[in-house]
Design a protein with these regions (language model features):
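Long, compositionally biased stretches
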Residues: 25-105, 125-177
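Short beta-strand-centered segments at strand-helix junctions
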Residues: 108-116
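N-terminal domain-onset segments
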Residues: 13-30
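A short glycine-leucine-enriched loop at secondary-structure breakpoints
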Residues: 120-122
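Acidic, glycine-rich flexible loop segments
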Residues: 117-118, 137
Length: 177
């Protein structure tokens, strides 16, 4: 699977989805180390991933169960500082745009968060939530949605994560942001 275009959502520039490179032709497997950081040429550009932002997803992500090692990186454009990149360290063509979510925002009910934490054996105080974001080109510009149904639940102490599918259907797969 290395080097294949596995994720087709063009999301490098949420404001103008047209400026996004085609994932099938973008990125390479170039990697370098720089002061405890991994530098990866990704479809989102050159990404710096520090060792303390490397995460293990023991079950992989939905549809990508064979990939377990990911890193969190910032986008190079400060206009999109609210977004992060979840970059696969095993296949540099595989990357997702994600949006950190404060557990206290109410987008996900506290009872549902507690149920997820109990299921995943994560202390709610150590929980980091990230939503997978999709950008679609529309006639009006870009449509940006986040997946509230299957958020990434990360244990900040152990640096392990799971994509947890919420039991309630009230959480949309495509929540407009």
């Amino acid at each position: 699977m290395k080097g294949s275009a596995m994720y087709s959502t063009n999301a490098a520039d949420p404001a103008t989805a047209e400026e996004v490179p085609d994932p099938a032709g973008a990125g390479s497997d170039a990697t370098a180390k720089d002061n405890n950081r991994l530098i990866i040429d990704s479809r989102f550009g050159s990404l710096a991933i520090s060792q303390n932002s490397v995460l293990d997803f023991p079950n992989g992500l939905l549809g990508f169960g064979e990939f377990h090692s990911f890193g969190i990186a910032d986008l190079s454009d400060p206009r999109y500082a609210q977004f992060k990149v979840l970059q696969c360290l095993e296949d540099h063509q595989l990357a997702f745009l994600v949006l950190p979510l404060d557990p206290n925002t109410g987008f996900i009910d506290r009872a549902d968060l507690e149920a997820a934490c109990n299921s995943l054996l994560v202390d709610i105080g150590d929980l980091v939530i990230m939503l997978v974001v999709t950008v679609r080109k529309t006639e009006q510009g870009a449509s940006i949605t986040a997946n509230l149904r299957a958020p990434l639940m990360i244990d900040s102490k152990t640096h392990t994560g799971n994509q947890y599918v919420m039991r309630s259907e009230r959480y949309p797969v495509r929540f407009q942001i």
